[in-house]
From Swiss-Prot:
Keywords: Antibiotic biosynthesis, NAD, Oxidoreductase, Streptomycin biosynthesis
Taxonomy of the source species: Bacteria, Bacillati, Actinomycetota, Actinomycetes, Kitasatosporales
Annotated GO MF terms: nucleotide binding; oxidoreductase activity
Binding positions (NAD(+)): 2-32
UniProt-listed Enzyme Commission number(s): 1.-.-.-
InterPro entries named in the record: Gfo/Idh/MocA-like_OxRdtase_N, GFO_IDH_MocA-like_dom, NAD(P)-bd_dom_sf
Species per Swiss-Prot/TrEMBL record: Streptomyces griseus
Homology family: Belongs to the Gfo/Idh/MocA family.
Pathway assigned to this chain's UniProt record: Antibiotic biosynthesis; streptomycin biosynthesis
GO BP terms, alphabetized: streptomycin biosynthetic process
Protein's recorded name: Streptomycin biosynthesis protein StrI
KW NAD (keyword) present: yes
SUPFAM superfamilies reported in the protein's UniProt record: Glyceraldehyde-3-phosphate dehydrogenase-like, C-terminal domain, NAD(P)-binding Rossmann-fold domains
Amino acid sequence: MRVGIVGAGRMGRLHARTLLELPDPPDLVVHDVDPDGAHRLAQELAAGTKAQVTVERELADTVTKADAIVVATPATQRRAPLLAAARAGLPVFCEKPLTADETEAAELVEALAHTRLHVGFQRRCDPEYQRLRELIAAGELGRVLLVRCTAFDHRPPADAYEETAGDIFTDCLIHDIDAVHWLTGQPTVAVQADGARLLAGSGYDVATAVLTLADGARAVLSASRLDPHGYDHRVEVLGTKGSLSVGLDARTPLRLLGQDGTGCPPGPGAQPAYQDFTDRFEAAYRREVLAFVRTVTEGAPSPCTGQEALRAQRVAAAAGRAARTGTRVELDPAPHGAPAALVAGAAR
C-alpha cells in the first residue's frame, strides 16, 4: 500500500511516523506547498525504515500514485487535496476541521460522500473516552444530565496560527463538541458562548460554551490558550445514577488544595505534567491511524464520518457567532449537506 501525506508540518509528520511504525509499513508519498519542507520530512522519515518514502511536487501526481491520502495541511489549504482525493475515489484521512469555512466544509462532505472518509477527532480513539462511552451506553450513569469539558492548552499558539486554524471554538473546542455528541449520542440544538482576549494574542484566548442537547441535557465547555503548568484536557459526565471523569490522573497539571492548605497532585505518584496534545493523546493518535488503515485495507467503518465532523463544525461556528453577538444560537440537529449546485461547482 502507498499512502500520500499531504502536508509536511507537525500533524503530517506525526501521522507519517505512526504509519511507518506499523509491522508492515506502507510506502509514503510526501507533498507540501513548500517543496523544501516536503523533502526535509521525507529525508527524516526515510531514515531507519524499510518503506520507500518519496516526494511529489504536484498534488495531482501524489494522488495518482497513492492508494489512500492523509490530509494534514492547515485548514485553509485542505479543499484542493480533498477534492482531488474525491475525484480519484481514494480513502481519505483528514485532520479536523475539514476546512476553515463551514459552508465549504458542507460542500466537501457532499463531494466526498462516495469515498471512505475519516476525520481526525482523535478522542474517539482514546481508550479512556471509549470506555466512558461504553459505560454511558450501558446505562451505568443513568440518564445523562450534564457533561463538563476542560480544554486548557499549555502555551498559546502564534498569532498567525488562528488565521489558518480558526478561532478557539473551531480549532480547540470543536474536539469537545464532537466528544459530547459521540459520548451522549445527542446532537446540539442550541448554543450560548462567550470569549475574551486576556493575553497578547489576536483572538479569544479564554472561552466558554453551553450546549443544549436534543434530550435537554447540558454540556459546559471551558477553554484556555494558556495553562502555565501543562496541558489539561478532561471530561466529566453526571447522570442520574452517578458520575465519571476522564483525564484526571497523576499527569494532570492540577493541584488539589487540602485542608492543611498544601497542594497535591490529583493522583498518586505525581509525574511530569502533560505538555501538549500529542503527549496526552499519544495512544489515541496511534489508534486512529490504525483505524484508518483498517478502513483502507478491510473496509472497516470510519470512526468519524464527514457528516459527524460537519455537525461538530456547525456547532463550533455557531458558538463563535454566539460569542461575538451575545445571543443564543438555535441549530437544526439533523445532519445535512450542501446544495447540489454548490457541490457541482466545488468539484470543477
